[in-house]
Amino acid sequence: EFHLVAEPVERELADGMIAHLWGYNGQSTGPTIEAVEGDRVRIYVTNKLPEHTTVHWHGLILPSGMDGVGGLSHPGIPPGKTYVYEFDLIKSGTFMYHPHADEMVQMAMGMMGMFVVHPKDPAFMRVDRDFLIMLNAYDIDPGTYVPRIMTMADFNLWTWNSRIFPDIDPLVVNRGDKVRVRVGNLTMTNHPIHMHGYHFKVTCTDGGWVPESAQWPEVSIDIPVGAMRAYEFTADHLG
């Protein structure tokens, strides 16, 4: 069981820069939900926002009534109320969650998070280090604290896990580690990812794990809007 509380939050995007956002459980991006393939999960969502909301489980295969699309498969969660989502995790992989209610406001304010479903077999696609990066973008005027809403492409702050360079957390590994990096993109534009000094293999997409025979080597990869990619490499260089 998990409990998400949709609420206003404060987030330090960079040293000394505080933004007034919306998120989950006091943070934006929201907490990462982790479970195992085959689990049945029950997720309580409490709405402490000034308007109705939903949670859409982006990429997960589940019943329509649990998909969290406001006005289509879900009436929305009114302010002050709690809704319970419950569904089975039928495949492993990397997924995301976000509202499908007043998206141009709620997602622009930072409401999103990652959802990782680990394989039932712990030996399948095993790595030594496993990192998550959520790409998000904001439009915040200098000297202000609240993002502009209803913005399609005029973002001025690009964040990794809601942190701005150079205050992004480093990926710390040991030499020789097999490393996986999972990247989800909930901005409004495609985003290329490049690893300086390394090549890697793309091992997972939105559709699932890529068989070893189909994995391809890369030094840069484009992450489409609303998509996820995972890549792996061996950390055989110091620095």
Where are these regions (language model features)?
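Copper-binding active sites and cupredoxin-like electron-transfer domains
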Residues: 1-239
